[in-house]
Amino acid sequence: MPLEFEKPILELERRIAELKETAKATGVDLEAEIRLLEERLARLRKETYENLTPWQRVQLARASGRPTTLDVLEKAFQDFIELHGDRAFADDPAIVGGLAYLEGEKVVVVGHQKGRDTKENLQRNFGMPHPEGYRKAMRLMDLADRFGYPFLTFVDTPGAYPGVSAEERGQAWVIAQSIQRMSRLRVPAVTVILGEGGSGGALAIAVANRVLILENAWYSVISPESCAAILWRDAKEAPKAAEALKLTAKDLLQLKVVDAIVPEPEGGAHKDPDRAIRNIKEALLKALEELKGLSPEALYEDRYRRFRSLGAFAEP
């Protein structure tokens, strides 16, 4: 389903396609008209995608077709072996993880996983993990620490599942445990925010030495809709909330919440997922190279300093 701000672009694309079909069917030379429209389309695309509002970027971050964790694992990694279950209650499909190779190096990978359609989203709980998902992630953190493998995570969740069943099984406590466990890793840890980075559900697997974010992804303590419902008593004020939350990649880089922005193809990662995944792989390799050679103690201290330096402080 097209986004509202993309409709003028889609209309021009439709008109160009119609002219090409007409020229092919009738033999009439419409090359000049087509070229003019294509030039106009290029300008419109550039103007639109270079001046996106925070709310428009949130919409792009949620677009169907963006690369998921499993997409990245399939195309950027080799020999991925998925591990299931938390060895306590169940397996949570909203979080996937396991062992893989990245350019010949053994790594442990964990990430949120959304579905492509309604059926798969129901199975994956729309990427909202239960406590057993975070326990599975911690199991993999321990595995990475034990064998000295780099620990890589991919974030794409509106937040941890807030249902009664999750609360009964200790959702808040498990998120806190996961944050603590990841902060104590003695191996290189790198996080990539693929789409949505919603609150503690995202942070639970994002306490890394390097945090990267895709150009149109977002990362915040709360979703714009929820923030608007609380502050303005109306979820329709989400665009205003998105502006106030400073949740875009550019804002987060300025605030030093993230360390680098991974560029997306024009129009968003869903327009050319393969190219987006190549960019992700390149950014991951660069981040790992920066951490290469650091001792376990130095990696721990690097991560500690990174998170202690976040925020703004005013002396009384």
From Swiss-Prot:
Record keyword Cell cycle present: no
GO MF, any single term: ATP binding
Catalytic activities: N(6)-carboxybiotinyl-L-lysyl-[protein] + acetyl-CoA = N(6)-biotinyl-L-lysyl-[protein] + malonyl-CoA
Pathway(s) per entry: Lipid metabolism; malonyl-CoA biosynthesis; malonyl-CoA from acetyl-CoA: step 1/1
EC numbers: 2.1.3.15
UniProt-listed GO biological process terms: fatty acid biosynthetic process; malonyl-CoA biosynthetic process
Compartments reported by the entry: Cytoplasm
Keywords: ATP-binding, Cytoplasm, Fatty acid biosynthesis, Fatty acid metabolism, Lipid biosynthesis, Lipid metabolism, Nucleotide-binding, Transferase
GO cellular component: acetyl-CoA carboxylase complex
CoA carboxyltransferase C-terminal domain residues: 36-290
InterPro entries listed in its UniProt record: Acetyl_CoA_COase_a_su, ClpP/crotonase-like_dom_sf, COA_CT_C
Function: Component of the acetyl coenzyme A carboxylase (ACC) complex. First, biotin carboxylase catalyzes the carboxylation of biotin on its carrier protein (BCCP) and then the CO(2) group is transferred by the carboxyltransferase to acetyl-CoA to form malonyl-CoA.
Subunit structure as annotated in this protein's UniProt entry: Acetyl-CoA carboxylase is a heterohexamer composed of biotin carboxyl carrier protein (AccB), biotin carboxylase (AccC) and two subunits each of ACCase subunit alpha (AccA) and ACCase subunit beta (AccD).
Protein family according to the UniProt entry: Belongs to the AccA family.
Annotated protein name in UniProt: Acetyl-coenzyme A carboxylase carboxyl transferase subunit alpha
